[in-house]
Regions:
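Flexible loop/turn segments at secondary-structure boundaries
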Residues: 8-12, 38-40, 58-61, 80-82
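Hydrophobic (often cysteine-bearing) scaffold residues that line and stabilize catalytic clefts
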Residues: 11, 43, 47, 81, ...
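Structural motif
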Residues: 21-24, 42, 89
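Catalytic binding pocket for nucleotide-activated donors in carbohydrate/polymer assembly enzymes
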Residues: 26, 53-138
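C-terminal amphipathic helix plus adjacent low-complexity
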Residues: 5-7, 12-21, 30, 35, ...
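Conserved active-site histidine-acidic residue motif and adjacent donor-binding/catalytic loop
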Residues: 29-42, 57
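Acidic donor-binding loop of glycosyltransferase active sites
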Residues: 45-55
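Hydrophobic targeting segments
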Residues: 1-3
Length: 192
């Protein structure tokens, strides 16, 4: 079964017609309408695998699926909008679900659909990783964004031109030359 979002009756009819033309029972396409967010997340329990789209990846929808425990399969696109799911999967420790071509995507989708232990293994890893990897670590995200804001403010206060910098895993700023600079010196807080 393929579960899709119900948004456009014309698209729904076209997809059902295309399925029938390819010898697939159109009733195997299930279209689900909008629900309140909590109910929407709850219905994820009946899904086995989230198949991402190209050229525009799922963004919040993929994040919701991962939070609900559904492995997401994606194909890395060429532009930002086609690389979001790859970033999400990397941040939750499941980069093996990021494919580099549509042929690879199709092959892995078929393997996951027919190899229950393989799919179960990804589900179990996702369950373990969800609270241990950066994707859903709100405290870490806050430390990093605060470090970035502090650095931008410091640069502006010194009347320097805006410049590139990164934020290290423990909330330290990485200057372009690679030397970490301690954060929150004005606030006196521990960036760790």
């Amino acid at each position: 079964m393929l579960w899709l979002y119900r948004d456009n009756r014309h698209a729904e009819a076209n997809l059902r017609n295309e399925a029938a033309a390819r010898g697939i029972d159109p009733s195997r396409l299930v279209f689900a309408g909008p629900l309140p967010h909590g109910d929407h997340l709850a219905r994820h329990r009946v899904a086995d695998l989230f198949l991402d789209t190209l050229p525009y990846n799922a963004h919040t929808t993929a994040s919701d699926a991962l939070w609900a425990g559904i492995p997401v399969l994606t194909c890395r696109g060429k532009a930002f909008a086609g690389r979001v799911a790859a970033s999400l999967l990397t941040a939750v420790g499941l980069s093996e679900l990021v494919t580099q071509s549509l042929d690879e995507y199709e092959s892995l989708a078929l393997r996951l659909a027919t190899d229950a232990p393989l799919l179960r293994g990804f589900r179990q890893r996702l369950e373990r990783n969800r609270l241990e990897f950066p994707l859903f670590d709100t405290d870490r995200f806050c430390r990093h964004i605060e470090a970035a804001y502090t650095t931008m403010w410091d640069v502006w206060q010194r009347r320097e031109k805006p410049r590139s910098f990164g934020v290290a895993p423990h909330g330290e700023v990485i200057r372009p030359n690679g030397n970490p600079a301690a954060q929150h010196r004005q606030a006196g807080t521990d960036p760790g």
